[in-house]
């Protein structure tokens, strides 16, 4: 049975992967965004929230790594933490580049609209719909993976709760066993003491009976054979 600490480490890793995929999906949406700026701002707000959640899980994993008893496991987890940090920095770089690309595309489209007028608006609408379809397809795929990871996280949490409940049951059973052991020891001592006392009582009865018989024989002897 896995230790609660191991289950927590596995949950952290799964959530880190989930948030990483969600960040990548949002960055792809930013790359495909052709405006307006309000849509870009909304996407950036979502990315910031996901980065905050990702950073928090990485910090939790790092704390769990430092609490490991075995040095080998500690170093292995710290290496995983370092890899996650590098991946997060890479995502942040991609995020900045995606913003630059999106803003440049918005600027170019606005300039084209001024030059081409109505034709540009129709072309922009068609381009935006095509990009939206592509983005939607990519986002659905990544979110599908994210949902799968969420289910795994939930299953791990349920396993952890079951583990904690089982641990409590074992502790209660251990306490009951200790109590029963004490009772058995006390009963054994009482039985031993009773057996000894019973033997002593039998010996005393035997001696009293022997003394009684000796007295009777002595009296009979004196009555029947006084000359002896």
From Swiss-Prot:
Name the UniProt record assigns to this protein: Vesicle transport protein SEC20
Residue spans, topological domain Lumenal: 221-228
Chief location: endoplasmic reticulum
Chain segments annotated as coiled-coil in the UniProt record: 37-90
Listed GO MF terms: calcium-induced calcium release activity; SNAP receptor activity
Functional note: As part of a SNARE complex may be involved in endoplasmic reticulum membranes fusion and be required for the maintenance of endoplasmic reticulum organization. Also plays a role in apoptosis. It is for instance required for endoplasmic reticulum stress-induced apoptosis. As a substrate of RNF185 interacting with SQSTM1, might also be involved in mitochondrial autophagy.
Disulphides: none
UniProt topology in membrane: Single-pass type IV membrane protein
Superkingdom assignment: Eukaryota
GO annotation, cellular component aspect: COPI-coated vesicle; cytoplasm; endoplasmic reticulum; endoplasmic reticulum membrane; intracellular membrane-bounded organelle; mitochondrial outer membrane; nuclear envelope; SNARE complex
Post-translational modification: Polyubiquitinated. 'Lys-63'-linked polyubiquitination by RNF185 increases the interaction with the autophagy receptor SQSTM1. Undergoes 'Lys-29'- and 'Lys-63'-linked polyubiquitination by RNF186 that may regulate BNIP1 localization to the mitochondrion.
Gene for this chain: Bnip1
Residues in the Cytoplasmic compartment per record: 1-199
InterPro entries named among the record's database cross-references: Sec20 (IPR005606), Sec20_C (IPR056173)
Residue ranges crossing the lipid bilayer per the database entry: 200-220
């Amino acid at each position: 049975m896995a230790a609660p600490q191991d289950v927590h480490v596995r949950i952290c890793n799964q959530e880190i992967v989930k948030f990483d995929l969600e960040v990548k999906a949002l960055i792809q949406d930013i790359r495909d965004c052709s405006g307006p700026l309000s849509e870009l701002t909304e996407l950036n707000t979502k990315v910031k929230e996901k980065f905050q959640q990702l950073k928090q899980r990485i910090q939790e994993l790092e704390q769990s790594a430092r609490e490991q008893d075995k040095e080998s496991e500690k170093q292995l987890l710290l290496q995983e933490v370092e890899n996650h940090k590098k991946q997060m920095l890479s995502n942040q770089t991609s995020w900045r580049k995606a913003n630059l690309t999106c803003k440049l595309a918005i600027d170019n489209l606005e300039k084209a609209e001024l030059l081409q007028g109505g034709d540009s608006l129709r072309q922009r609408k068609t381009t935006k719909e095509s990009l939206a379809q592509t983005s939607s397809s990519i986002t659905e795929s990544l979110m599908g993976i994210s949902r799968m990871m969420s289910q795994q996280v939930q299953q791990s949490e349920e396993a952890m709760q079951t583990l904690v409940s089982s641990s409590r049951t074992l502790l209660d059973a251990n306490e009951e066993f200790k109590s029963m052991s004490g009772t058995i020891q006390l009963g054994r001592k009482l039985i031993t003491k009773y057996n000894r006392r019973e033997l002593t009582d039998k010996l005393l009865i035997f001696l009293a009976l022997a003394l009684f018989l000796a007295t009777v024989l002595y009296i009979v002897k004196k009555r029947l054979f006084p000359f002896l």
